[in-house]
Amino acid sequence: MVKPIIAPSILASDFANLGCECHRVINSGAEWLHIDVMDGHFVPNITLGQPIVTSLRRAVPRSQEEEKASGEVARPTAFFDCHMMVEEPEKWVADFAKAGADQFTFHYEATKDPLSLVKLIKENGIKAACAIKPGTPVDVLFELAPYLDMALVMTVEPGFGGQKFMPDMMPKVEALRTKFPHMNIQVDGGLGKETIGVAAKAGANVIVAGTSVFTASDPHEVISFMKEEVRKELKAKHILGDETKH
């Protein structure tokens, strides 16, 4: 069983006020933060590295239990979903696990041995996910999926935010949902109120949304709308899980 998850992409946030921006979207209903890591090689853009994740983890702890143990005033908590658009992702696993990542999403196209990489990620105590670019066929994930915590179908070309959603990627989502009904399936790129219905109907339950959330005058309304669209489709497919569990 799966539940609706909205993961605002911090690539669309005001980096001068990153901690406050993250608190704002978490307080608006987001449980995950999507952290895009780009190296300028696998994709042409360069974004951020593990020092930012380390700093952000201090501002956004994993859980209230962790907060209570520290004795500090409770702050918003979130799951850190690190999307690694990098060459040789293997060499970054330990650093990002130490920095505070909860999930390490590598690109299928960036590694020669995806199964060994999944094992390495899990040995470092975090969740493992695999992403595919728009030009990569979905069936490359079928053998790997039983070992994954999540699959990511890119709905734009990776590397830059603010691109238009590619609806022709939805058959990939449908194929994954049919074969793996209880798996987290994420879509990333161009998601907002206008496109969420198509993605939800295809079977996506983890929605990366950047500009549509961070630039909204009312991010709570946007997040709530998208969650409800996903919830309706998961319920119709009889795979809606308990949303009180984290």
Curated annotation (Swiss-Prot):
Its EC number is 5.1.3.1. Keywords: Carbohydrate metabolism, Cobalt, Iron, Isomerase, Manganese, Metal-binding, Zinc. Binds 1 divalent metal cation per subunit. Active with Co(2+), Fe(2+), Mn(2+) and Zn(2+). It comes from the Eukaryota. GO terms for molecular function: D-ribulose-phosphate 3-epimerase activity; metal ion binding. CDD domains: RPE. Substrate binds at S9, H83, G159, F160, G161, G162, D188, G189, G190, G210, T211, S212. It catalyses: D-ribulose 5-phosphate = D-xylulose 5-phosphate. InterPro entries: Aldolase_TIM, Ribul_P_3_epim, Ribul_P_3_epim-like, RibuloseP-bd_barrel. Pathway: Carbohydrate degradation; pentose phosphate pathway; D-xylulose 5-phosphate from D-ribulose 5-phosphate (non-oxidative stage): step 1/1. GO terms for biological process: carbohydrate metabolic process; pentose-phosphate shunt. The keyword Nucleus does not apply. Pfam families: Ribul_P_3_epim (PF00834). Its cofactor is Co(2+); Fe(2+); Mn(2+); Zn(2+). A divalent metal cation binds at H34, D36, H83, D188. It is an enzyme of class 5 (isomerase). Catalyzes the reversible epimerization of D-ribulose 5-phosphate to D-xylulose 5-phosphate. Belongs to the ribulose-phosphate 3-epimerase family. This is Ribulose-phosphate 3-epimerase. It comes from Candida glabrata (strain ATCC 2001 / BCRC 20586 / JCM 3761 / NBRC 0622 / NRRL Y-65 / CBS 138) (Yeast).
